[in-house]
């Protein structure tokens, strides 16, 4: 086996009041896919920022091919062959594919950009990536997330990156795009590159990776140089510091009367009329590939988009919602897929994010904010939902994804909400926080609320839901009871015929 090409030696990173990394030491080999695992806040992202020159370590050294380095900025790291493919892509949406691929090294001729050469180089790399059908002149904003990710990888290859790190790369990809990414990662390994792979998906670790390093609370817990003898439960135990027998923790409960009925609803992204019921106490899943119409259907229900036909009956009363605000007042709340841009106010505090929807309840004489009541309400939900935050005044964008999701849920608990629509509720969330989110959803169902979970995670929908509606190409093709919802059956229904 080859010697370590990349080595972290006693890396520590400190911020005011927080030790993000605490003397982390481990190594990765050339020609290896090395998984980095841990709960949100465990230190994985901070480590990648040290590697890429975004954060400078307080102590310790980084060794690459036997030479010590401390990068002052991202440009230095890039010059030494390091590329990071972040979960939030760094492409310029209004530039073309070719311009994004060669940004910083655009070919010139007589002082001008040589566009013919630029497009030719872009075509070569696109062919290498299996994306030869993409026109190099296409604006990046017109590509799918999976295609954009391939452009990021292509940019790394054009810079001859020897170390490529992926941060939750499959969190927004379709099944087909995920397969393509796995092929590319295998190719990078076969070419002798170091591939660091951050993921919360256990199946990806065992399918794709050669080694795994586990982090917890900023510390290196263990590096497994081989996955032989390693199983799901052992990894989870190392990540959370305790044994979790069942992440999903399904809780059977009584299912009540019909809470909401969808009759012949159709609109943008929903190509045929949909008929669907949600009952009190029920967790109903909506599964399908990216673009299948799951989120689009719920956007029609919640008043985000206008339906072209059909209606919604809530508690037996037919309703037409012209806006999400009307839906919320009626008792329907949606927690969106994109938490950062649609679910939270990122620079506002945890308290402000918790209270934003119910501020009308905390007024003096109907006009002025009652700060003390808002603080009490925030502290109540922080404790009730076990939100990990230094203070109710902490900016929400400093919290992990799981804790941000709890804040969004807590916001609606203060309202009189009967139906909770959760769009990809555990995307990018670690295993411990996932269990907490599932427990909260079961709590809501046991209180007689209705819960709809939109998810592209087969294991999730088949494990936590009482029934699963499967959508394909804007059509609800079947509704499968939990007892019959094997992953093979659900995927078979979701894939194109």
From Swiss-Prot:
Query: Start and end of every ABC transporter domain?
Result: 6-242, 250-497
Summarizing the function annotation, the protein's role is: Part of the ABC transporter complex AraFGH involved in arabinose import. Responsible for energy coupling to the transport system.
Q: What is its main location?
A: membrane
Q: Topology in the membrane?
A: Peripheral membrane protein
MF terms (GO), sorted A to Z: ABC-type L-arabinose transporter activity; ATP binding; ATP hydrolysis activity
Cellular component (GO) terms are: plasma membrane
From which source organism is this entry? Chromohalobacter salexigens (strain ATCC BAA-138 / DSM 3043 / CIP 106854 / NCIMB 13768 / 1H11)
Question: What name appears for this protein in its UniProt entry?
Answer: Arabinose import ATP-binding protein AraG
SMART domains reported in the protein's UniProt record: AAA (SM00382)
Identify the PANTHER family for this entry: ARABINOSE IMPORT ATP-BINDING PROTEIN ARAG, CARBOHYDRATE TRANSPORT ATP-BINDING PROTEIN MG119-RELATED
* Subunit-structure text: The complex is composed of two ATP-binding proteins (AraG), two transmembrane proteins (AraH) and a solute-binding protein (AraF).
**Its Enzyme Commission number?**
7.5.2.12
- Tell me the keywords, alphabetical order: ATP-binding, Cell inner membrane, Cell membrane, Membrane, Nucleotide-binding, Repeat, Sugar transport, Translocase, Transport
The answer to whether the entry has keyword Cell inner membrane is: yes
